[in-house]
């Protein structure tokens, strides 16, 4: 049985693990913290705008397991909020245990608190990876889904310092780039002002610290829009955030809250003293990042170069997924890239032809997005911005599951991930 090791247990790594395991591989997920899903533990937004199409494409391709979980655990469905339609918000406090149960049911080995810090190579082949305590882990194929956030030095250098986010680098150690340890060069995104990286685009408030009126609004509608006084409006934050699909004027002129179990405040950070001056926020307290009044994690600091099969350029048995594989924003994007990486990892290990998704599908078009001169300042997401507009122009924004299945069937790819 082929052995596949996945480094990083976020949404992309989990998606890769499920796909590789269902192709018969022996799969191990090495995650540096004590939780799977990483930023998925504080995200929660699914199926908004073009992400609906991408979710249905994944389901038609055979990668529906994780969407079944997020759909089942959604606190609100079919929600329209500023700039976004038909969104679902999953319960970020319940999703990780459910995903962990799925992996155990499938027989996937989960290695928590296992930070991979080095690699061993023979030419262009990775022969093993080394954990922080010196253990050597061998495999036929490796998949890197370590993300692109931090570590602390980058958040200090290119942000406002460590914000004490869900990744908890001070406790579990910094992210290590496997591609760089293997001798490859990574890319870093740039903001319009030339500063590297981009802030995570939201912070989470304990719902109980909000007024009863706001809590009831969130429980009923799933979101709330609270106008800001002019003196508290800061439009500069919009260009600093990773989530350009939420870099719209309403997100600067208002506090927009989304109910994901926490109250998700759609701003990278917000001075706590100023926040408490807004009606309904007099007792507000941040849950993630703990220093959300000062800053947020800095992302897109370590993106690898890959081909259309998700294979790292320069290494023959390493594949990439999630933010490690491109300037992609969101859980759906992570699941999409990870699913293909996991499937192709199993194909590679078995000596079978790998799959490149066609551009007749939104996922295939996303993976084929080409860099321009300003490519390092661009973000790609099904949910908004430039790429969502491209989806609509190309007729890839399909809102009926039967239309999505028809497009997948036309490429003879129905349930391909399970064949």
What feature does the model see in each segment?
Residues 346-381:
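Active-site-proximal substrate-binding core of FAD-dependent oxidoreductases
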Residues 10-11, 35, 324-325:
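Residue-level detector of alpha-helix initiation sites
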Residues 242-249, 294-328, 371-382:
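FAD-binding beta-loop-beta segment adjacent to the flavin cofactor pocket
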Residues 3-28:
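N-terminal Rossmann-like FAD-binding beta1-loop-alpha1 element of flavoenzymes
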Residues 110-250, 262-270, 274:
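Predominantly flavin-linked oxidoreductase catalytic cores and closely associated redox partners
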Residues 326-346:
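A conserved FAD-binding loop/helix module that cradles the flavin
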Residues 25-26, 30-118, 151-154, 159-201, ...:
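Conserved N-terminal/central alpha/beta ligand/cofactor-binding core
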Residues 377-419:
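C-terminal auxiliary extensions adjacent to catalytic cores
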């Amino acid at each position: 049985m082929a052995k596949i090791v996945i480094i990083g247990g976020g949404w992309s790594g989990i998606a890769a693990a499920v796909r590789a395991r269902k192709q018969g591989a022996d799969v191990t997920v090495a995650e540096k913290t004590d939780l799977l899903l990483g930023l998925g533990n504080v995200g929660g937004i699914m199926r908004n705008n073009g992400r609906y199409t991408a979710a249905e494409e994944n389901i038609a391709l055979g990668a529906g397991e994780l969407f079944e979980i997020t759909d089942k655990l959604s606190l609100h469905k079919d929600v329209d909020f500023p700039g976004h339609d038909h969104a679902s918000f999953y319960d970020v406090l319940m999703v990780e245990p459910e995903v962990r149960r799925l992996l155990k049911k499938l027989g996937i080995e989960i290695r928590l608190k296992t930070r991979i810090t080095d690699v061993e190579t023979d030419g262009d082949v990775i022969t093993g990876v080394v954990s922080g305590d010196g253990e050597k882990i061998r495999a036929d194929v490796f998949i890197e889904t370590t993300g692109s956030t931090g570590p602390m030095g980058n958040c200090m250098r290119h942000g406002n310092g460590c914000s004490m986010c869900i990744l908890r680098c001070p406790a579990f150690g910094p992210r290590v780039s496997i591609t760089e340890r293997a001798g490859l060069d990574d890319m870093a995104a740039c903001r319009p002002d030339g500063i590297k990286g981009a802030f995570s685009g939201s912070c989470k408030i304990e719902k109980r610290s909000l007024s009863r009126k706001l809590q009831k609004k969130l429980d009923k509608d799933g979101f709330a829009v609270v106008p800001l006084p002019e003196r508290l409006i800061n439009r500069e934050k919009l260009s600093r955030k990773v989530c350009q699909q939420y870099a719209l004027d309403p997100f600067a002129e208002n506090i927009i809250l989304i109910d994901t179990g926490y109250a998700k405040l759609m701003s990278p950070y917000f001075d706590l003293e100023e926040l408490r001056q807004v009606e309904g926020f007099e007792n507000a307290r941040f849950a993630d990042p703990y220093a959300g009044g000062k800053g947020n994690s800095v992302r897109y600091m370590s993106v690898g170069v890959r081909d259309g099969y998700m294979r790292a350029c320069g290494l023959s048995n390493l594949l990439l997924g999630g933010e490690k594989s491109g300037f992609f924003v969101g859980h759906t994007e992570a699941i999409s890239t990870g699913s293909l990486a996991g499937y192709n990892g199993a194909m590679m290990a078995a000596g079978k032809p790998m799959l490149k998704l066609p551009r007749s599908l939104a996922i295939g078009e996303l993976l084929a997005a080409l860099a321009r001169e300003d490519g390092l300042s661009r973000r790609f997401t099904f949910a908004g911005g430039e790429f969502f507009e491209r989806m609509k122009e190309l007729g890839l924004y399909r809102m009926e599951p039967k239309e999505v299945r028809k497009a997948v069937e036309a490429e003879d790819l129905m349930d391909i991930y399970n064949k």
